[in-house]
Amino acid sequence: MHYPMFSHAPEPADQQHQHNGEERTAALCVESTLEPHEAWAALTEYIHLWWPRQLLQSEESHIDLSTELLLEETADGDIIPVARIIQCENEDVLTIAPYPGTRLGRLLGVVEESEESLSFILDALTPETAEGPLSLLEISSGTYTGREDEELGIYEEQEEAAALLMGAYSRFIGAELQKEEL
C-alpha cells in the first residue's frame, strides 16, 4: 500500500505499465459467437479439453481448475499444482499465477521470488449482425484490476505462453486467435 503523505516512502512500481523495463508488445484475443456464459464454461469447466499438451507432464495427464489452484493429475495419480488462482470472477476474469518448475512456469520464466500472472478477461459484445461475435476473451500479463484506464496486453517474454494458451482455447471453441502488435 502506498501512503503519499510519507515523503520518505518509495513510489510503488507500476506493474501494469512495465515489467522489468519492458512494455506490453502484443494484444491477443478471441472473438466468439458463443454466449458469454458458454465462453466462460469453455475456459473454466472444460479446461481439460483444450489445455495445451505441451504444458502437461505427459499425454495422459488431466488438468483441472479448483477454487484455489490449477491442478494437473498425472497418469500415476500424482496431483501437481500448476498455478495459484489469484482471482476468479464468474463470466468476467480468471487470473492465474504459475508456480516455478511447472512447464507453464518455466515457459513464462517464473522464478521463486517473483509472481508472474496472466489474466483471462471475458467481455460480452453487442453484435452488429445476427452472426456477429457475442463474446471476446483477452489475455493480459499481470493481475487485471478492472480500471477504465488499465493497459492490457502481453509482455514480449510472455507472448509464447499466452499465444499457446489462447491458440488452444480458440481451436477448442472453433474461433480464431487474433493478434495485434502494440
Where are these regions (language model features)?
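Hydrophobic ligand-binding cavity/cleft-lining segments
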Residues: M1-H62
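Generic short beta-strand segments
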Residues: F6-P10, Y46, A97-R103, S140-Y144
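Short, highly charged C-terminal tails/helix-capping segments
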Residues: E11-P12, E60, G167-L182
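Short, surface-exposed coil-to-beta transition loops
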Residues: T25-A27, D78-A83, E113-S119
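Glycine-rich portal/gate segments that line the openings of hydrophobic small-molecule binding cavities
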Residues: H48, Q54-V110, G167, E176
